[in-house]
Amino acid sequence: FKNKSSKLIPIKENLVDKLDHKYAKSRVKKFYRIKDEDAGQVSSKKISQLLKILAKKSIEIQFISSPENIAWLLNLRGNDSNFAPIPNCYLIIDKNKNIYLFCDPQKINKNLKKNLKFLQIVNIKFLGAFLENIHNKRVLIDETTCSFFYQNILSNQNAVIKEVDPIYHLKSIKNKTEIRNTIKSHIFDGVA
């Protein structure tokens, strides 16, 4: 590209999604929540812990682009990967506890929607437009998981703080249930 004076231009639509549209509809797999007793901690407590960290750093909004962190925070799981129960989604949380989950709405059944009544479910195709409407805020992103495209959108009108997602730290402190389940999974993995 260098010698040909080519230039990469970002586009708003994912061209692969346009080609894969019919196939994608036939393979929609629903999200689900794990029981609080299986997670060892209710998601509301995890959210409160995260909000305390954000308040200490004077962060007004966090854009969470790591699906595994969203899975942990909400006790939410998905079948979007063959090898891990990770839901393909993004999350925005603000200092006032407004939470927006961006995903394919077909992946949310009525029962799950009731369980997630503390947040708003937004079609993932509106994520870019939603981010463009955030102005004059201190926004935390983790640049190791946030795409350059979304970083650029947020940087246009906001003070973007690039730090490691604080959820990684919260996840590293295991509760008794998580420790017990980790030991179980190692045993099952060893037997296999």
Sequence positions of predicted segments:
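Active-site neighborhoods and metal-handling regions in enzymes and metal-associated proteins
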Residues: F1-A192
